[in-house]
Design a protein with these regions (language model features):
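Gly/Ala-rich beta-loop-alpha elbow adjacent to hydrolase catalytic centers
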Residues: 106-115, 132
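Alpha/beta-hydrolase active-site loop signature
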Residues: 36, 65-70, 135
Length: 264
């Protein structure tokens, strides 16, 4: 496991490369994180997923988008277009590190959207995994707004700071989504376009949801699409006083099993 900086010298991205721990596959994996508190909750799960895939012989790269985590940049200046481009930069870096001929993209929540968008313009993405994906950006934003509006003052500690600002920025669970980013996220629709250039697709969901079903119905026209319902913990945006993480083993194991099975 090797931390690294990649991309341009002016705006480097932070990533972690997991080299294969078994006979190397001729395919690498880029893991695309979710955003905000979901990133914090999912960090350990994505790390474990990367370690398990490395044990199956995959080169794996997980990374932080511009303006998030340990990457350079300011969240105020980030855009969906930039984060989609970051996925492309991660693909390039992984291919340089490993000399693999193709890549697989695994995205969780909003990361699933960025992975899918990045795959549309490429011919080297062999597999795409969308895990509990955000299907409608508008619904995603509305859910955050409901959580903010429903919050009650804390009895046991200081106020959380969750609020919606006049410019549209959302402050939720310690993270800020600037108004410009919120507006671009609201326009996202994962079911609007089938990623036809991808060789194989797995939609893995840990709970039943009408938007998941809508995506399944839109993407099932792909000849190598698989929908998998694997019950697992899925409250990605929950936060408690102990900084709880989410480690949904059934979902992680399901993705690893599919990746291993689908390897040529």
């Amino acid at each position: 496991m090797t931390p690294l900086l990649f991309g341009s010298a002016e705006a480097p991205l932070y990533g972690v490369h997991h080299p294969p721990q078994a006979t190397p596959q001729n395919s690498g994996v880029v893991v695309c994180y979710p955003f905000g508190q979901e990133y914090m909750r999912a960090h350990r799960a994505c790390r474990q997923l990367s370690l398990l895939l490395a044990k199956k012989g995959f080169h794996v790269l997980r990374f932080d988008y511009t303006g998030t985590g340990n990457s350079s940049g300011d969240a105020e200046d980030t855009t969906i277009t930039q984060w989609k481009a970051n996925v492309g930069q991660a693909i390039y870096e992984l291919k340089e590190l490993s000399d693999v001929s193709s890549v697989s993209l695994i995205g969780l929540r909003l990361g699933a959207v960025f992975a899918s968008l990045a795959s549309l313009d490429r011919s080297d993405v062999d597999r795409l995994v969308v895990w509990d994906p955000v299907v409608s950006g508008e619904d995603y934003i509305a859910a955050l707004q409901r959580e903010i509006a429903a919050e009650r003052p804390s009895t046991y500690g200081p106020p959380s700071g969750n609020r919606e600002l006049p410019d549209g920025a959302l402050h939720y669970n310690g993270f800020v989504m600037p108004g410009s980013l919120r507006r671009s996220v609201a326009g996202l629709r994962l079911d609007a376009q089938v990623p036809t250039s991808v060789g194989r697709i797995l939609q893995l969901v840990s709970h039943e949801d009408a938007t998941f079903a809508r995506l399944r119905d839109a993407w099932r026209t792909h000849p190598a699409f698989r929908y998998q319902f694997t019950p697992a913990p899925h409250d990605w945006n929950f936060v408690d006083n102990f900084g709880g993480i989410l480690l949904p083993q059934p979902a992680i194991q399901g993705i690893v099993a599919w990746m291993a099975q689908e390897t040529p």
